[in-house]
Amino acid sequence: LIKLNNLQYNPIKLDFLEDQNYSLDSLVSNFDFDDLCKKYKEKFGFSKIKTFSFSKEGFLGLFLELKGKIAVSFGECEALIQGAKLYESLGFELTWIGLNKDGSVNYQELKDKDIDFLFLSSCVMDTFFEISLDDVKNFTNAKIISNGSAKIDSLSDIVYFDNYKLCGYSLSGVILFNDENIFELLNMAFIDTLAVKCCFEALENQKFNYEVKEKFLEKLKEKLKDNIYFFVDNKKTLPYTLHFALKNIKAREIIRTLAFDNIFLSNGEGCSLGLSKPSRIIQAMGYDETTSRNAISLNFLQDFDEETILKIVDKIEQKYKQIRVLD
């Protein structure tokens, strides 16, 4: 199995017998869960933890708890974007921060804006274009709320995690913060302790390979020549990710055919979440829907030797040519 889509979907094995220790009882001490919360604090530096439904309704709930003016980047995850649109539909004001043609966030749209909370992560979804939160803080004093599933930045004031991406199950999202006046803490019966446990395990075991990207990219260029192109500069994306596009085919065609060879790629969230939609991120960068269907997103967790890299690239080239001939 060659999984190059782990940042979109990375199932882990759950031990339900051990998980019985995370059933909270109001009449006894809950040592295992208390210890787990301490581990979160030691690892990430946040003292408060809560869970929420990782859906548009769940994000709507977070928006309604925030006492202040909110801005959301178009480069964020699908559930957040849908939640923000739902928030707007109820009559609340919200500021949208767009993406530039090169995939970066348009910081200029933050200028002179009265914002209290900014939903902005340290990388853009799908392309994994890196965002400098240090630069962002030159444009706004808003508290930054970030998705830490692919990368965690110490400059984020609040961090949340997508359990579906981290462990493969649609468990609650986990959010970490310090100021209890921002979000209301949950009563014991409403904490999704399994989500908290699975999230931590996934983050503890999360490993990335920083060596494969350049080798893989070089082989792709050699084999595919003029048939490969790029929406973003891969020197500006996370060092364990790669984003490219193939001319004149829909990414889903090559994704489906490679799956039969146990090689798993992604076009982005719209593909991995089963929405059957092309990358919304590429469209937010100013490209049309048809063009966005060409995009392919990879990430590297494991190490691959030269022979394996060549084997994967050869298979991509072979399937690409077959699809072009059939078309």
Q: Regions from the language model: what does each represent?
A:
Residues L1-D327:
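Pyridoxal 5′-phosphate
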